[in-house]
Structure formats: C-alpha cells, structure tokens
UniProtKB/Swiss-Prot annotation:
May play a key role in the regulation of the intracellular concentration of adenosylhomocysteine. This is Adenosylhomocysteinase. Substrate binds at T64, D139, E164, K194, D198. HAMAP family: AdoHcyase (MF_00563). Its EC number is 3.13.2.1. Keywords: Cytoplasm, Hydrolase, NAD, One-carbon metabolism. PANTHER family: ADENOSYLHOMOCYSTEINASE. Belongs to the adenosylhomocysteinase family. NAD(+) binds at residues 165-167, 199, 228-233, 251, 286, 307-309, 352. Pathway: Amino-acid biosynthesis; L-homocysteine biosynthesis; L-homocysteine from S-adenosyl-L-homocysteine: step 1/1. GO terms for biological process: L-homocysteine biosynthetic process; one-carbon metabolic process; S-adenosylmethionine cycle. Its main location: cytoplasm. The keyword NAD applies.
Amino acid sequence: MENDMETATMTQDYHIANINLADWGRKEIEIAETEMPGLMALRKKYKNAKPLKGARIAGCIHMTIQTAVLIETLMLLGAEVRWSSCNIFSTQDHAAAALAQKGIPIFAWKGETEEEYWRCIASTLEGPKGWTPNLLLDDGGDLTAHTLQKHPELCQNIRGVSEETTTGVHRLYRMLKEGSLKFPAINVNDSVTKSKFDNLYGCRESLIDSIKRATDVMIAGKRVVVCGYGDVGKGCAQSLRAYGATVYITEIDPICALQAAMEGYRVVTMDEMADSADIFVTATGNTDIITHEHMLKMKDQAIVCNIGHFDNEIDIASLQDYQWMNIKPQVDQVIFPDGKRLTVLAQGRLVNLGCATGHPSFVMSNSFTNQVLAQIELWQYPEKYPIGVYVLPKHLDEEVARLHLERVGGKLTTLTEKQADYIGVDPEGPFKSEHYRY
C-alpha cells in the first residue's frame, strides 16, 4: 500500500490507499444517492444556476461514501474542492478511490498516522497554479484551527466555514470569545435537521453496528454505561436498551440527567459503575471521561469505546505501557499486569467510523444538505455574515426536512388561512420560533 500511495502522490493530485478500489466505490456511491434525497434535490434545483461557481472549498470531513455524494454535489453546484478526512480511521478507501479516479483532489486513507493526518489537511490548503481556498467545510475544527494558526495569510480571502459537529462548534465559540476567529462560521450542528437526526437517529443505528462488527458480543443482558446524555447519548441509549441491555447514564447537566431518569435509565457516576459494567461508551465531547483509575477497576473483558469526535474522552495514553494484543483492525485487547484484558475499540477514536461505516446515507443527507445550504449562504451573501458564529435560518431547516419527508412516505397537513392566523404563522412556514425546542 505504501508504494501505491507514493506513486499516487508523485503522479496525481491526490493521496489515497488504492486507486483500484474505485469501481467498488462508484457502485456504492450510486446506491447512496438513492438514499440521499436532500442532496439530489439540491443538484436538480441548482444545476443550472451554479450558486457555488468560483468557490474553492477546502473540506475536512470523514471521507466516506456519503461524503463522496456531498463532494460531488458541491462540484455540480460549481465549486472546486480539495478534501481530507477529519479522523485517521474513518476513511472508506473505496470512496476515496472513486473520487480520485475522477480527478478530485482527495488526501485520505484509513489508518493514517498523526503526522500523515496533518499533512493531508495541509494538502487541502494549497493546490496547483496557486490554488487556495475561499471557503472551509469542517468537522471537529482541525481544518479551521490549522488554517488560523499555520496559514493566517489565507484568512482574508476565506468567506467563512461551515462546521459539522458539536466539538467543532465548541471550538468556534471559544475562538470567537478569544478573538482568534478571523472569518464567519455557520454552526451546522445546531440545525434541528442535523442535531436531532444525525446525532440521535444516526448514532442509534451506527453504535450498535460498530460494537457488533468489532466484538460479536451479545448486547442483551449486558450492563452498559453511556457517558453523556445529549443527542448522541440519547441515540446510543435507545439502541442499547432496544437490544436488551441494562443502560446506565453519567451526566454533569441536571436537565439531561433528569431526562435520562424520566426515560427509565439509572443515572450514576463512573466511579460507582467502573467495576461492574460490561460495556462503556463515551459520548460527551469532553476530555478525561474514562480515566486510568476507572480502567484499573474494570472487570476482565470489559469493552471500552468512544463515539465523541476526539480521542481524549478515554485516557488511552495511560495504557501504552501495557501489553497490547491486536485482534483485528481497530480492535485491541490491553493486558494489564494482573492478566486482566480490556477490549479497546478504534483506539478510543470514533467507534462507528473506526469499526463500521458510520451513519446511514439517509440521515447523512439531512446533515449534508445543511452543509451545502451553509456553503451557498456564505458564498452568495457575505455581507450578511460579519465575523461571528451563526445558525441557518428556520425556513432552511424546515426545507431540509421537507426534502426528506416524501422519501419516508410522509405527507404534510396544510394550514388554512384561518388556522395560520390563529397561531400567528405563515401557512408556508416557518412554523416554530427560533427558540423552540424540538
């Protein structure tokens, strides 16, 4: 594989694992398109107008089959792109190959080193003939931070960034507060059709998929701790309970904790569950959630995994001096001095993309339709967005939902003029206030 990657780097403007996987990738992309009605609707609506003509987008999102559909949508709307993955394990090599074969600059492969990861990001910021980006599309904030810290000279020409995930949004707000954010940002994560669908329904399916693929373990009857009860944690807890697990929740937020209790989950602390649970899932977007001390208490063959964006929720670094036995890709057993074995999935990185293929295409169509709309907003209406962090307006959020409803057989009721007047809305929407909690 190394020789193939070296050859690719020298002869083409891409860096991937294996170009021979392209045909397989193309077949899966075509299947995914049938499950991504939002993106396909945007292609149809804007194919002639080309609202992204002139846009040069540097992207950093998991290089999956679904992301391939996003990339090709951006290009059909007029954009040029250069792309890397936001996680060293999340790339689907056949997806990367399918795009590279079409001449799209992709810098991603499954199993990158940390050094290679940052080199791939750097490759998206510089292209042939002086190519540099004027828009960013990010997931987790690494591309944004790298641009601000390593390439400040690019910032004056960047109209903005659209950010995909909770962790990246936290970083954006911190940068804004510190004064280090030099261009506007659209917080895609907090669009209702992203956070209440991708984060919840996506994780509800992909967590179980990844644990089963990695371990073949029976979920029914297991005691499982889910750390965090935001939208991601809610989806994880629902799926685990549906499979017959006894689910325990850890939380810092009393509102989320009370929600968990009202759903019938036990709200506990890691300290009290570390020595008795069978499976641990972190879903907080925070650091040091499962510590070395917690793992010392865990029983033999306990399974530890993370579905938050970064790999610092579980203190994997503290285990490096122990013996590691690789079972299969992204599945390791850590053997403690007393002989206890702890099963670690994806080295503490995103388990659903490290050990499986991530969220299903349909729910990613929700998220990525928001991304395309955010890119159009930043490109077409820069005067509306001084430096700051924004969310997409409610009418666009509702439009994303509308584009997906028919695909699942849904039909909307139409308000009469009298009904619309009674509740004070336009018959065509938006139907809720900006502060409404879905």
